[in-house]
C-alpha cells in the first residue's frame, strides 16, 4: 500500500520520525505535489481541480492507498469529500509549534512532527 503525500512538503525533507511513522502506515511513500490554488479561484474552479487530482490519484495508484492531505483548505475539503466517499483513508500531520524569539524581536518558528491523525 502507498501513502500518497499530497502536500507541498516533499517526503525527502521530512524528519526521520515522520518517515518512520509514514512507513508504519504504508509500504511506500509517494510524493504528489499539492496544486497551487489562486486566491481568485472560484468554488467551481476548486471543485474541477479536486475532480482532476482525485481522478489522477485513483487512476494512477488505485483506491488501496492512504492520503496524507495538507494544503489550501477549500481544496483539501473538496478532496477529502471525494476520498471519503470512496472509503480512502486520509491523514493529517500533527506538529508541535516551537517559537524562538531573538533579542532583536525576530521570531524563528519550527514545527516538530508528532503523529499522523486520521480525518474523521
Give the label of every model feature segment.
Residues 1-65, 78-81, 85-120:
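Long, low-complexity, Lys/Arg-enriched
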Residues 66-74:
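N-terminal glycine-rich "phosphate-gripper" loop used for MgATP/nucleotide binding
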Amino acid at each position: 500500500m502507498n501513502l500518497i503525500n499530497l502536500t507541498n512538503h516533499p517526503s525527502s525533507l521530512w524528519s526521520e520520525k515522520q518517515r518512520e511513522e509514514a512507513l508504519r502506515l504504508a509500504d511506500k511513500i509517494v510524493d504528489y505535489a499539492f496544486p497551487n490554488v489562486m486566491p481568485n479561484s472560484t468554488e467551481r474552479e476548486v471543485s474541477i481541480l479536486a475532480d482532476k487530482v482525485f481522478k489522477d490519484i485513483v487512476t494512477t495508484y488505485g483506491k488501496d492507498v492512504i492520503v496524507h492531505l495538507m494544503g489550501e483548505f477549500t481544496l483539501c475539503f473538496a478532496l477529502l469529500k471525494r476520498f471519503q466517499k470512496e472509503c480512502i483513508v486520509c491523514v493529517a500531520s500533527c506538529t508541535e509549534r516551537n517559537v524562538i524569539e531573538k533579542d532583536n524581536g525576530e521570531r524563528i518558528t519550527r514545527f516538530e512532527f508528532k503523529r499522523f491523525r486520521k480525518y474523521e
